[in-house]
Amino acid sequence: MIRHLITTKDFTKDEIEDLFDDAQKFLNEPTPHLLKNKLIITIFFENSTRTRSSFEVAAKRLGAEVVSLDVSKSSTKKGETLFDTAANLNAMEPHAIVVRHKSAGVPYILSKYVSCSLINGGDGAHAHPTQALLDLFTLKQHFKAVEGKKIAIVGDIKNSRVANSNIELLQRFGMKVILVAPPHFLPKTDLPISYDLHAIINEVDAIMSLRTQTERHKYPIYASLRDYGNDFCITKDLIKDKDLIILHPGPVHRNIDISDEVLTDPRCKVLEQVKNGVAVRMAVLKKLIMHG
């Protein structure tokens, strides 16, 4: 049966633990070319540095062929519908397609038009499942057991697909989540919230800082990003010598999301997230293509 990864809910807890076992092996051992002669197509309708390159490196390390569709030169710019694009890509008989789109729901809809696994590389402010998976993997790598650990998600939560996916996944694995942001960056939620980062810093084991999604704002909310950073930047003065770790999905707005000093602090796991992202995406590709 063909399976897709549209949201984190598409995999059970047991399946995710198995994924993480594979990801750890990929980090520790030479990678066998498990996907030799397999074809993976990436099509990103929104800009991406980390996610796209991470999927492509993951596929190539597994021995797969990768075709990246340049949307700026594709037929969608000439009036071809998304569904025609999906049908044409599907006719090339790929084994998986990775899609990113600015509109929520597009990967789910496209999955109905293809006969291979479709992976959501991010859709609007809806979901980014592989980012949440690599974030959880990074947290488990550090804490071993994450159940009962408390994480603050800080920043533009309302517009963040990363936050949406992490809120679902981290809670499913027993983590406590608190949302920290100015009121206009918070979604309607039953989760605990705070408008003051300093007020909750002593009660959390981890902080996930998010980028301000200015491209998704209908009008300027802050006079400048610097004003936002004055209240919500993760600084050395904030974290002092506390026993916690810091995550960020990237790209980081330096000295607005996280200070230069904290980015070089060993408690900041941003580069580990990038490294882990390749291994986790390798595990996802292996699972969907080889096992369904």
From Swiss-Prot:
Organism: Nitratiruptor sp. (strain SB155-2)
Family the entry assigns: Belongs to the aspartate/ornithine carbamoyltransferase superfamily. ATCase family.
Enzyme's top EC category: transferase
Pfam families for this protein: OTCace, OTCace_N
Keyword Transferase recorded: yes
Residues the entry annotates as binding L-aspartate: K78, R161, R211
Cysteines joined through disulfide linkages: none
Binding-site list for carbamoyl phosphate: R50, T51, R100, H128, Q131, G250, P251
Catalytic activity: carbamoyl phosphate + L-aspartate = N-carbamoyl-L-aspartate + phosphate + H(+)
InterPro entries, alphabetized: Asp/Orn_carbamoyltranf_P-bd, Asp/Orn_carbamoylTrfase, Asp/Orn_carbamoylTrfase_sf, Asp_carbamoyltransf, Asp_carbamoyltransf_Asp/Orn-bd
Purpose: Catalyzes the condensation of carbamoyl phosphate and aspartate to form carbamoyl aspartate and inorganic phosphate, the committed step in the de novo pyrimidine nucleotide biosynthesis pathway.
Pathway per the UniProt entry: Pyrimidine metabolism; UMP biosynthesis via de novo pathway; (S)-dihydroorotate from bicarbonate: step 2/3
Keyword check for DNA-binding: no
Gene Ontology terms describing biological process: 'de novo' pyrimidine nucleobase biosynthetic process; 'de novo' UMP biosynthetic process; amino acid metabolic process
Single GO term (MF): amino acid binding
EC number: 2.1.3.2
Any GO CC annotation of this UniProt entry: cytosol
SUPFAM superfamilies named in the record: Aspartate/ornithine carbamoyltransferase
Subunit structure: Heterododecamer (2C3:3R2) of six catalytic PyrB chains organized as two trimers (C3), and six regulatory PyrI chains organized as three dimers (R2).
Protein name: Aspartate carbamoyltransferase catalytic subunit
Swiss-Prot/TrEMBL keywords: Pyrimidine biosynthesis, Transferase
